[in-house]
């Protein structure tokens, strides 16, 4: 099992509330994920606040732009010292290669760089509406292969896709899976979901888990229970 596979997704519009939650968690059991809303609201200072508390951070901004712009964006993320950041694979091979090249000067200190394939909220019908006339899983495989060709570290994918992607792309290619819900949790707006043990067994390396931990009466107890279920 990957060391610290749990990535706690933070989703707050109040920084103090976010830090109060973070202070209840254990950096030895999880890493944290910050997305577009929180980074737009609170900026790089939030990243520094998280690092000061001993947590690794996945800066989930899903960059998608021309290659030069994305290269500069991932460089900025590296300067912040984040553990992982990401781009949209649909930005294309040249964009992903430019992003990867931009991180070379950081050597072993470079953040992991992964790509988003198909958002877990997207159904086959949703894909058809944007001109992609193949099933979601087929499109995921196509984008994941392109990501590996660009020499990125892995992809975000649904847990249902993990087993085939591992066999297709190899054990060293990391799979980060949202849509993870412990037994009894509300599936929310995620269409493709699994429990944490199911996802790891399927080949996922990192599990993105938000509300089952952040909205729990006792967030640390919820984190500990999920962590224990994976041991």
UniProtKB/Swiss-Prot annotation:
User: Which InterPro entries does this UniProt record tie to the protein?
Assistant: Aldolase_TIM, OMPdecase, OMPdecase_AS, OMPdecase_bac, OMPdeCOase_dom, RibuloseP-bd_barrel
Enzyme class, UniProt record, top EC level? lyase
Residues of the active site are: 62 (proton donor)
User: What does the UniProt keyword field contain?
Assistant: Decarboxylase, Lyase, Pyrimidine biosynthesis
Give the CDD domains listed for this entry: OMP_decarboxylase_like
Molecular function (Gene Ontology), one example: orotidine-5'-phosphate decarboxylase activity
Q: Which GO terms describe its biological process?
A: 'de novo' pyrimidine nucleobase biosynthetic process; 'de novo' UMP biosynthetic process
Give the residues the record marks as binding substrate: 11, 33, 60-69, 120, 181, 190, 210-211
**Which Gene Ontology cellular component terms are annotated?**
cytosol
As its record notes, the protein acts as a catalyst of: orotidine 5'-phosphate + H(+) = UMP + CO2
Asked if the keyword Lyase belongs to this entry, the reply reads: yes
Q: Name one Pfam family in it.
A: OMPdecase
Pathway the protein contributes to: Pyrimidine metabolism; UMP biosynthesis via de novo pathway; UMP from orotate: step 2/2
This protein's source sits in the domain of life called: Bacteria
Q: What is its EC number?
A: 4.1.1.23
Family note = Belongs to the OMP decarboxylase family. Type 1 subfamily.
The record describes the protein's role as: Catalyzes the decarboxylation of orotidine 5'-monophosphate (OMP) to uridine 5'-monophosphate (UMP).
Provide the assembly information: Homodimer.
Q: Do you know which NCBIfam families this protein is assigned to?
A: PRK00230.1, pyrF
Q: Report the protein name in the record.
A: Orotidine 5'-phosphate decarboxylase
Annotated organism of origin = Shewanella oneidensis (strain ATCC 700550 / JCM 31522 / CIP 106686 / LMG 19005 / NCIMB 14063 / MR-1)
The lineage, from the top, is: Bacteria, Pseudomonadati, Pseudomonadota, Gammaproteobacteria, Alteromonadales
Chain's gene name: pyrF
């Amino acid at each position: 099992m990957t060391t610290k596979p749990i990535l706690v997704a933070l989703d707050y519009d109040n920084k103090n509330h976010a830090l109060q939650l973070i202070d209840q968690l254990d950096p030895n059991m999880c890493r944290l994920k910050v997305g577009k809303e929180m980074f737009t609201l609170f900026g790089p200072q939030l990243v520094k606040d998280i690092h000061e508390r001993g947590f690794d951070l996945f800066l989930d901004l899903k960059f998608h732009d021309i290659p030069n712009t994305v290269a500069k964006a991932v460089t900025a993320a590296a300067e912040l010292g984040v553990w992982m950041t990401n781009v949209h694979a649909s930005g294309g091979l040249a964009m992903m290669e430019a992003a990867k090249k931009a991180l070379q000067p950081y050597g072993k200190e470079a953040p992991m760089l992964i790509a988003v394939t198909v958002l877990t909220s997207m159904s086959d019908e949703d894909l058809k509406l944007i001109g992609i006339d193949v099933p979601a899983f087929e499109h995921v495989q196509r984008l994941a292969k392109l990501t590996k060709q660009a020499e990125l570290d892995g992809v975000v994918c649904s847990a249902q896709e993990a087993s085939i992607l591992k066999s297709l792309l190899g054990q060293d290619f990391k799979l980060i899976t949202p849509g993870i819900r412990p037994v009894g949790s509300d599936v929310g707006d995620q269409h493709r979901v699994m429990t944490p043990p199911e996802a790891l067994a399927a080949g996922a390396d990192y599990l993105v888990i938000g509300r089952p931990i952040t909205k729990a009466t006792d967030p640390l107890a919820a984190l500990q229970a999920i962590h224990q279920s994976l041991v």
